[in-house]
Amino acid sequence: MLKKAAGSALLRDPQLVKDILTAVVAAVDVPVTLKIRTGWSPEQRNGLDIANIAQDAGIKALAVHGRTRACGFKGAVEYDTIAAIKHTLDIPVIANGDINTAEDATNILAYTNADGLMIGRGAQGNPWLFQQIHHHLEHGTPLKKPSNQIIWQVLQQHLYGLYDLYGEIMGPRIARKHVGWYLKQEPALRQQFNHLKDPLHQLDFLNHYF
């Protein structure tokens, strides 16, 4: 994307962002949304300017990842910037970045006053995060963590889906990354699993663990 001057590279060219968004909004009759970062680099933070351009172009909702492109996923998330964008815009603003627990979600919503949350890496290996967040927002208390039995049931469905979609050769290979998210607290087990090439061997290995 960056080599083609697309994606977050566009943050360096606000006029081009304006032209693209205006053209897209005019070309379709469905609501158009946008996701941005806070800028190209810490020295080139222009997320607020881009957000205003987006709203003026007719964007109906804006998701903001609270880091610059140069920061990647490292460093602290700029929740202050997300809050400033939310304060300035009239359209819904969705906060994104380091939402890993229900408590994170509650605190980020309160701090930024965002209209919603966009969750990515925090849900990898933890699809229960959404239910946990909903419960915490509704009741103010943490939801009990899923049992190993429930985790195994969901993981089996995940694996069977991968095998069905990608086949018996590529399926197990792709499964290594996905299972790694579930086993991120168990690096030794993850390493053992990564040597397994057969679907049945993978399932048997995980069945013994869970």
Where are these regions (language model features)?
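Glycine-rich tight-turn/loop motif centered on a GG-T
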Residues: M1-L16, R67-Y79, T141
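Ser/Thr-centric signal marking residues that sit
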Residues: T33, T68, T112
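A cross-domain feature marking catalytic cores of carbohydrate-active enzymes
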Residues: L34-T38, G66, A95-G97, R121
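General secondary-structure edge motif
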Residues: K4, L34, H65-G66, L159, ...
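Alpha/beta catalytic cores of nucleotide-metabolism and tRNA/nucleoside-modifying enzymes
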Residues: D19-T22, A27-D29, E43-A61, F73, ...
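Active-site beta->alpha loop and helix N-cap motifs at the rims of alpha/beta catalytic domains
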Residues: M1-V32, R37-Q44, Q55
